C-alpha cells in the first residue's frame, strides 16, 4: 500500500517501521472474516491475485511452515456507500497473538534498534542481523528461509509494503510460528497515482522499492538467497 510511512534513517539508510493507518477494517465474528475498504481502488485486486497465484502457481504452501492468507474481492455498504472491499479469512486462533518484526526487534535490540541496522555497511549484513535477531528472540526454526520467502514473494509481485509491521509471527502456548503470507496490496504497480497506465510498466521497475530496507528487489533477494538458499519456485 503506497502511503505515509514513518521512516527513521541514518546516513540515508532506512528501515520503514509503520504502515499508514487510514484503511478501515472490520471483523465479522460470525463468519470469522476480515473486511478492509479498498481506499486506492487497487489493493483488493492485488491481494486477491497474489493470494491466488501463490496458492496455485508456486510451491509456497509446500515450503516448511509456510501458508498463504486467502483473499478475495467483494462489495459492501460502508457509511451508506457501496465500496469495494478486500476479504480475508482470519488466520489467528483465539489462543494466539500476532507479533510484528517491529515489536520483536524493539524487545530484543532496544528501541534504538535502527541504529544497529545502520551500523552494518552492506545489505547482506543487515539481512543477517534481521534474521539472527528475530531467530534468537523467538527461537523459531528456519527464520532465514521464512524471511527469504517473503522477499522472493515481494519481488515476484513488486510488493512495496513489506515494512516491519507487515512481517509477523504468530505466538501461542507452543511458541512462535510463521504468519501466513499476507498484505500484498501494494503490488503490480497498480497505484495509478504513482504509476500512470499510459507509461510502459518497465519504465517504473527501477523506481520500485523493496521494504523493509528500501532497496531494489534484486538487491534484497540475492543476498538473502546467498545466505539462506532459494525458496520460492513459480510454476506458470
Question: Model-found features: residue ranges?
Answer:
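Intrinsic structural disorder
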Residues: 1, 142-143, 236
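Conserved ATP-binding subdomain of kinase catalytic cores across diverse folds
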Residues: 1-113
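Short C-terminal domain-edge/linker segments immediately following a structured domain
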Residues: 64-68, 119-121, 209-215
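ATP-dependent phospho-/nucleotidyl transfer catalytic cores
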Residues: 90-151
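Conserved kinase catalytic-core segment
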Residues: 124-193
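C-terminal catalytic region of ATP-dependent kinase domains
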Residues: 174-236
Amino acid at each position: 500500500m503506497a502511503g505515509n510511512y514513518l521512516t527513521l534513517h541514518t546516513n540515508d539508510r532506512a528501515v520503514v517501521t509503520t504502515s499508514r493507518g487510514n484503511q478501515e477494517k472490520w471483523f465479522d465474528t460470525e463468519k470469522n472474516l476480515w473486511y478492509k475498504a479498498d481506499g486506492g481502488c487497487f489493493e483488493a485486486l492485488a491481494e486477491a491475485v497474489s493470494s491466488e497465484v501463490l496458492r496455485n502457481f508456486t510451491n509456497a504452501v509446500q515450503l516448511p511452515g509456510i501458508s498463504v492468507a486467502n483473499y478475495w474481492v467483494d462489495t459492501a455498504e460502508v457509511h451508506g456507500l457501496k465500496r469495494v472491499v478486500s476479504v480475508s479469512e482470519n488466520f489467528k486462533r483465539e489462543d494466539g497473538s500476532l507479533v510484528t518484526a517491529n515489536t520483536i526487534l524493539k524487545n530484543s535490540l532496544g528501541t534504538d534498534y535502527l541504529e544497529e541496522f545502520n551500523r552494518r555497511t552492506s545489505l547482506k549484513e543487515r539481512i543477517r542481523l534481521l534474521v539472527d535477531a528475530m531467530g534468537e528472540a523467538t527461537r523459531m526454526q528456519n527464520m532465514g528461509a521464512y524471511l527469504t520467502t517473503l522477499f522472493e514473494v515481494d519481488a515476484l509481485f513488486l510488493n512495496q509494503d513489506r515494512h516491519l509491521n507487515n512481517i509477523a509471527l504468530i505466538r501461542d502456548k507452543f511458541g512462535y510460528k510463521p504468519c501466513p503470507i499476507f498484505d500484498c496490496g501494494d503490488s503490480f504497480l497498480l497505484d495509478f497515482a504513482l504509476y500512470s497506465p499510459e507509461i510502459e510498466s518497465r519504465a517504473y521497475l527501477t523506481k520500485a522499492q523493496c521494504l523493509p530496507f528500501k532497496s531494489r528487489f534484486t538487491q534484497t533477494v540475492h543476498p538473502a538467497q546467498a545466505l539462506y538458499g532459494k525458496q520460492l519456485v513459480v510454476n506458470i
